[in-house]
């Protein structure tokens, strides 16, 4: 049976995800509805992607009995309201990262999903790329020896993108880019809570975080560090170092196709998407998380074992603590 998707928001990321779903077997994935706050935008999106139903409100999509799982592609501050709306209507939910602007928002969504017995997952698509799966295998086999250090950085000059510097929309480098670095560190150290967090950063003129460097100490004295920036191009790589060697995820680390282990270079090409254009780098890689959601739902799971709800809460806790350390608060923090 095909998993029936409803797409919440007709923006660029939703377009890429819908393109991917269209390219997957129709016996496994079907997009049955799209909703935008403007009906004309929803209809235009539906025409482009051959979607049978277009709604001018998120409420209408949530009420559609044909929708099994909702993909939330709204702006950061709208995630909580749209996730809660879809959960209240009995839908499974895949929510774009960051799941919430702060830890309280994430906890509220997680509590709602658990109380209703519904599936909820934060769409950290990076976790599902074959290059990252290969890295996990390397770690499981202890190829690198005892792990000591994880270093990651992700920076692009995107201050010209209005959303990236919009304080009201919870822009800035941490929630947009830093979360990718942090999730790598968290993955390597098994979702443990860091014992110590320190951070330095500069703010952009709009009040969002511009460039931030974070140092995390974990149990056993092992470390993780990352730098993220919306005004500077960084190397956009991840390195994991142990007593027997190093592994590197190469640029683009957030959607990687290359892994170097102790100097041995391995490539993991994306599935082909002939004739399709994506808004974001390696957009076809969203197929891996889509397939994962279907597998989880087929098994009757309420959360993903690859990115648990507890880990989503932990990531939100750390990101919020870092923001506080550098003096960045958003309107949602005062609620």
Swiss-Prot record:
The organism's place on the tree of life at top rank: Eukaryota
Keywords per UniProt: NADP, Oxidoreductase
Site positions per UniProt: May play an important role for the adaptation of the alcohol substrate into the binding site: 176
SUPFAM superfamilies with a match to the protein in the record: Glyceraldehyde-3-phosphate dehydrogenase-like, C-terminal domain, NAD(P)-binding Rossmann-fold domains
Known catalytic reactions: (1R,2R)-1,2-dihydrobenzene-1,2-diol + NADP(+) = catechol + NADPH + H(+); D-xylose + NADP(+) = D-xylono-1,5-lactone + NADPH + H(+)
Site, May play an important role in coenzyme binding: residue positions: 71, 79, 97
Sites annotated May play an important role in catalytic activity: 180
Tissue specificity annotation: Liver, lens, spleen, kidney and small intestine.
Pfam families hit by this protein: GFO_IDH_MocA, GFO_IDH_MocA_C3
GO molecular function, one term: trans-1,2-dihydrobenzene-1,2-diol dehydrogenase activity
Regulation: Strongly inhibited by isoascorbic acid, 4-hydroxyacetophenone and chloromercuriphenylsulphonate. Stimulated by various salts.
GO biological process, one term: D-xylose catabolic process
Enzyme Commission identifier(s): 1.3.1.20, 1.1.1.179
Family recorded in the similarity comment: Belongs to the Gfo/Idh/MocA family.
Subunit structure: Homodimer.
Protein name: Trans-1,2-dihydrobenzene-1,2-diol dehydrogenase
Organism encoding this protein: Sus scrofa (Pig)
UniProt lineage: Eukaryota, Metazoa, Chordata, Craniata, Vertebrata
Gene that encodes it: DHDH
